[in-house]
Design a protein with these regions (language model features):
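Short, solvent-exposed turn/loop segments enriched in Gly/Ser/Thr/Pro and often Arg
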Residues: 1, 42-48, 104-109
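Short secondary-structure boundary segments
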Residues: 1-10, 47-59, 185-186
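Aromatic-lined carbohydrate-binding/catalytic grooves of carbohydrate-active enzymes
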Residues: 1-19, 110, 114, 187-188
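Short amphipathic alpha-helical segments, especially helix-boundary/capping motifs
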Residues: 2-5, 63-67, 139, 163-166
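A generic structural signal for ordered alpha-helices
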Residues: 5, 9, 70, 143-144
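A short, structure-level motif marking secondary-structure boundaries and short turns
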Residues: 11-13, 73-75, 117, 146-148
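Active-site neighborhood of glycoside hydrolase catalytic domains
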Residues: 80-193
Length: 193
């Protein structure tokens, strides 16, 4: 599992498996002992912070959007990438007893073809719908959420049809306004009604 789904990609976490400690399990267990829910936070398009090239991006250039980041960012318009991401997240959520999953769409954008994000919005909706379905098939209740831009205009610009997600109960929660200190709180309240 660790080869397929590396959970210890940051240097600080690499020391724990060598000492026989499963840090993810430990953190989740300690949260639950204290009555705190534990959520997995998954960046949809992580950037590589080492000098090593991302082999997956090198081997699947059709999964990548050429952008400001040297190796590009993940392209959710690719069905194959969607399946890879769904399998990746589902494996994590199956292995660990997280209470929920939050897909971070703000680290890093874009995740759809530049200038055509709204045109490709169904790709992200399809991804989130499948994720919700996968989570509902686990043997426990798992909340599904998304970290989103500061307002409706920014969501639409990035290709997130959050009104549809809310209407169809695709997400259980949103983390809003991550690119500003002045998010449109009223819009997020209306969205939740």
């Amino acid at each position: 599992f660790e080869q397929e789904c590396p959970c210890y990609n940051a240097g600080i976490y690499k020391k724990f498996p060598d000492k026989g400690i499963n840090i993810m399990e430990r953190i989740i267990d300690e949260c639950h002992k204290r009555g705190i829910k534990a959520y997995c936070h998954h960046r949809i398009s992580e950037v590589e912070l080492t000098s090593d090239r991302n082999e997956l991006k090198q081997n699947h250039k059709d999964w990548v959007i050429k952008t400001w980041w040297q190796e590009g960012l993940w392209n959710l318009a690719s069905k194959e990438l969607q399946e890879f991401k769904l399998n990746y997240v589902t494996k994590i959520m199956t292995k660990y007893s997280f209470d929920g999953i939050c897909i971070d769409f703000l680290r890093h954008l874009p995740c759809l073809p530049v200038g055509k994000q709204w045109e490709y919005r169904e790709c992200v909706t399809e991804f989130m719908t499948k994720l919700k379905s996968n989570m509902s098939n686990l043997n426990r209740q798992v909340a599904v959420g998304a970290k989103l831009p500061e307002n409706i205009e920014a969501c639409h610009k990035d290709g997130f049809d959050v009104e549809k997600w809310a209407k169809n109960n695709i997400v259980d929660f949103v983390v809003g306004g991550s690119r500003t200190v002045n998010p449109d709180i009223d819009w997020y309240i209306i969205l939740s009604l």
